[in-house]
Amino acid sequence: MKNKLISLTLLITLISGCNKSSSNINSSENKDDYKLKIISPTEAPAVGLLNYLNDKNYETNTVPNNIVAEMIKGTHDVVIVDLIGGLTAINKKSAQYKLASIITFGNFYIYSTGNDSNNIMESDDNIVCFGQNNTPDILFNHLYPNIGVDTYVAGVSDIAPIAMSGKINNENVDYCIIAEPVLFNVLNNKNALTYGKGSEYSNFQAKWKEIHGNESSILGASIYIKNETYQNHSNVVNSFLNNIKSDINTYVNNPEKAIELLDNYGSKEEQAQRIGLNSTIIKGVLEDSNSINLGYLSSKDSSFNSTVEEYLNVVNSTLINKNNYL
């Protein structure tokens, strides 16, 4: 009888051990270690991804059209690009992505080089814009319908030397469409030929609210998730999005955290090479009432659909399609 009890106890122990082992195996199997491949513009949108500076799967690009091209090809799991550019790629080029969130809300400005004697922007002034047919161009034409752009350059980084010299192709430039944090850098660069005479002429977000009301907003850089990636790795994607939301909230309320991440990454030159700006500029724009208008609006938020549709009804109503939201 004693031997039977020992055998029964041993059997229970073995079964229990097997169950634990099986549980451990299942837990290990359920863990998803998939690494997201991410691409974003430099400058303002990249501020939201400072925790990914050392991630080899995170890529930045200075030209939004290059990012849209990658989106159409489906090369990345996560694409950060302007709202209009991304939705156009989905609607017109069948890019297999969905809109997950919006992270900047109008960081465009007009910079006066000081060359215009009356400092009143008019149709005969020489005006330079970046991103032809993209968000800055569309917004400028909407906000200033009677004033045209004379010259276009590819990205906002191409605007900086023009704004600081006040010239393009040896001709005087009167006004530049620019974005924060590039504007901060231009205004504070003592080596710029326009230093001391150049100034912020107009804030697109303020102008927008003047026309459409204080509750309305420009919608800028947005996060798009590849359909296949979300289907196969939804937990990884949701974790990523939650982390970005938390990080942005931290950077806006505690700019020193953003500064610390950049300074730990490398020298000012290395920082600028990675995301187009450095910790000094980050400090300036985040502490200056968050002039890059960094924030987070999720496609799961109750106000998302109405906010996006209100904006698109003004700039491009053909892009409205709830099926394109995550």
Where are these regions (language model features)?
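Short, solvent-exposed loop/beta-turn-alpha elements that line the ligand-binding surface or hinge
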Residues: 122-125, 201-216, 291-302
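Secondary-structure end/capping motifs
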Residues: 230-314
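Bacterial signal peptide processing site
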Residues: 19-21
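C-terminal motif of bacterial Sec signal peptides marking the signal peptidase cleavage site
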Residues: 14-17
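Long, low-complexity C-terminal extensions of enzymes
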Residues: 318-326
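Sec-dependent signal peptide recognition
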Residues: 2-8
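Pocket-lining segment of extracytoplasmic ligand-binding domains
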Residues: 84-85, 163-261
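Short, glycine-/small- and polar/acidic-enriched structural segments
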Residues: 24-158, 167-175, 180, 191-196
